[in-house]
Amino acid sequence: MSQPPSGGAAPAATSASAAAAATEARMHPEGCSRKQQRAQSPARPRDNSLRQTAGATRSPLGVGPKLNSVRQQQLQQQQQQGNKITGRSTSGTGSRGLGGGAEKAVPSIPKGAVPGAVQPAPGAEGSPAAILASVSFRRSGQPEEAPREIESGPSKVGEPPPLGGVGGGGEGGGAGGGPGDREGGAPQPPPPRGWRGKGVRATQRGSSVAEGVSPSPPTAATSKTPGPGSRNSGSGSTGSGSGGGGSYWKEGCLQSELIQFHLKKERAAAAAAAAQMHTKNGGGGSRSSPVAGAPAICEPLVVPSSSPMAAAAEGPQQSAEGNGSGGAMQAAAPPSSQPHSQQLQEQEDMQEEMEKLREENETLKNEIDELRTEMDEMRDTFFEEDACQLQEMRHELERANKNCRILQYRLRKAERKRLRYAQTGEIDGELLRSLEQDLKVAKDVSVRLHHELENVEEKRTTTEDENEKLRQQLIEVEIAKQALQNELEKMKELSLKRRGSKDLPKSEKKAQQTPTEDDNEDLKCQLQFVKEEAALMRKKMAKIDKEKDRFEHELQKYRSFYGDLDSPLPKGEAGGPPSTREAELKLRLRLVEEEANILGRKIVELEVENRGLKAELDDLRGEDFNGSSNPLMREQSESLSELRQHLQLVEDETELLRRNVADLEEQNKRITAELNKYKYKSSGHDSSRHHDNAKTEALQEELKAARLQINELSGKVMQLQYENRVLMSNMQRYDLASHLGIRGSPRDSDAESDAGKKESDDDSRPPHRKREGPIGGESDSEEVRNIRSLTPTRSFYPTPGPWPKSFSDRQQMKDIRSEAERLGKTIDRLIADTSTIITEARIYVANGDLFGLMDEEDDGSRIREHELLYRINAQMKAFRKELQTFIDRLEVPKSADDRGAEEPISVSQMFQPIILLILILVLFSSLSYTTIFKLVFLFTLFFVL
């Protein structure tokens, strides 16, 4: 009957391993263990089904007697299965009986669990609700089952302990009997708080938690038999207490640590209570009958089952005591009623604490859920904002890259231009052309706007004058109307008096009232008219003040130019009467007339020279080429320099003449302005100077005549230029027609198309200022046009005879000459455009100086622009001269018959320019007879010489 020492070692080892496993499970709950990662991440939505099942599991706390019929049926089935398993089990040694429950444990449904609820996994700790439910069930069921156990005790002596009562069925597999069953009777001290038995881990691995939790009433029957099974008689409740340890919520390390802290406190309190119970009941423990031992076994089992911590603490202790007792079972004395009430009170306190802990756990869970949702929201918002900022930064980076590429391209372009200018020293032609075009457009726009402003100002002044006249007429009409009304009233009164009507009272009163009312109305109207007249007079005074200010400004300008009228004259001119001033003005006028005559003579000479050059050109065209092409090119290169020099001199002279004409026009305008100022100033001087008005008027008329003469001369210059261009184009066209003969060359169509293009270009140009004279024979009569049509050109030549032998050379020369003529046309067009721009600019500058509308900066910029235009025009003219010399050298030779036929035409050709000049002078008869005679004499002298 005695148990060998090795028999108690195995249960002790198993109990120690089970305790270590339970402690390890507490220290590392699910989600924080070293072997298994957490099933839920903070970002995942948690499954609330576990909480619902946990709440459903907690709901029947302490209500064991109120279980429904379904649960009772499940418990009965579990008991029947336990009885079957105990009947099948074989008897063996104490170590075999101790470990049998751990080896052959069948998992069963907990007592308080719903059939559809989630069950804890094998090796996990049971929920406190299930533990408390099992405790309450045992408390209510023990008094009823005690007699049954007593009766069935003798029949079961010597049987091995059943599955439900084996210590290996719960966590405390090696738990011994009650606290009073030791041999010496002295109570063992409770184990330290950090002590962990080995049986805990062994039982935890055995996956028999459900069997230790579910109580079976027949387990107490095994306590009657002495031997190895008697040691484990009380292990049913102890195992249930240890197997029903505090379940850890699968939520996180923080919750598990909090629960461990509270469970340690409860375990310490339960250990203290158990120690007190041992001290009270330890002395009365002795061997007794099985009947007396039954309540002793059942009563101590209630205390550790009330708290899972106490059960876990007492499990290893009881297993150690059971192993050390040598298999002797000692019956404990029946406890008194006072410790029983204390145990009940402590159990209720523990239940309240458990409820509080659950509530705290729920609040902590809710707070953790809220924190997790907030963390998820913050993370999502942070990610969204970060993504938006990243996208914006990318867009900004793309825009910056585009701008950098554009700026780099512009920088490289500017550097290339700068390097090219530094290497070659040439100005960009495109930029120059664009600037010229912009300048031309700006000038045209400014001129047009100036004209429009002048027109609008004139219209405004005319409308104001008309309004004033209409107001005066309206006032006069109103006054006349009022006078007529007064006369009509008087006539009515006279007619009434003559009739001598008798019903006077009312009519006389009305008649007496109406004259006073009419007088008041007349006075009001007159007052209104007087006010309007006063307003008109104010406007007139304001206008007069403005004119006065303007004249004073002009007078100040004149004084700054010529000095004050009353100031002493310089040393060369003795201060005297105004007659000296008049003499000076007359002298200036004579000088201007002489310069105008000289310019006219030079113009005539240049025109005659132009005609002579044209005649020489025609003569050169009629000559035959003697020799091969190489001597021809040598002659061209030799005479080219001479012709260039000659034409350059002619162009320079014409340019100087144009400048002199412009300067004279400006001087003439200044003189007229000076005379106007003198005229205005002379009105405020003494009466002794009134006799000079006639002289100043005569001088003014002479100046006007000189100005008209200069304008006519400038118009004639422009007319001659235009006629020269027209004649050149006609001559070239006729030359082409005469050279090609019957065969139609495409050059004719090109020339015609060029002429058409010129006309279209002239039409497409913006409108310029009004020209001061007719251009190009626009006002010529039919006779003059007929005479012009008779000018000697190559069209009067007879058709050429048979072609010479060198036909290919002649054709090649013709093609080269036609291309050169086309280029000459374009150059002539450019020269004409630049000359018109220059003349318009001169006129505009002269007008600006006259009216005082120009500033110093504008004057300097315009002078620079004029110089640039002069240079461009001179270069183009030089190129045109060179091209003309080249064309002259490329003339196709003619036969001797053609030269003989051409000689009589050249004789008449010498007198035609004189006839044309005389006709032009007759048409423009504004010149004096002396100038006309001088011009005719010069023409005849030139041709005779």
From Swiss-Prot:
Compositionally biased tracts (Low complexity): 1-23, 72-93, 110-126, 219-235, 328-345
Gly residues compositional bias, start-end: 164-179, 236-247
Stretch forming the signal peptide: 1-25
This protein's record includes keyword Phosphoprotein: yes
Keyword NAD: no
Phosphoserine found at: S567, S779
Pfam family for this entry, one: SOGA
Key words of the record: Coiled coil, Membrane, Phosphoprotein, Signal, Transmembrane, Transmembrane helix
Coiled coil spans: 340-724, 809-833
Gene Ontology annotations for the cellular component aspect, listed alphabetically: extracellular space; membrane
Region (Disordered) location: 1-250, 265-293, 307-366, 494-522, 741-811
Location(s) in or outside the cell: Membrane
Bias-annotated ranges (Basic and acidic residues): 141-151, 353-366, 494-511, 745-766
Membrane-spanning residues: 913-933
Single GO biological process annotation from the record: regulation of autophagy
Family label: Belongs to the MTCL family.
Name of this chain's protein: Microtubule cross-linking factor 3
Organism: Mus musculus
Gene from which this protein is expressed: Mtcl3
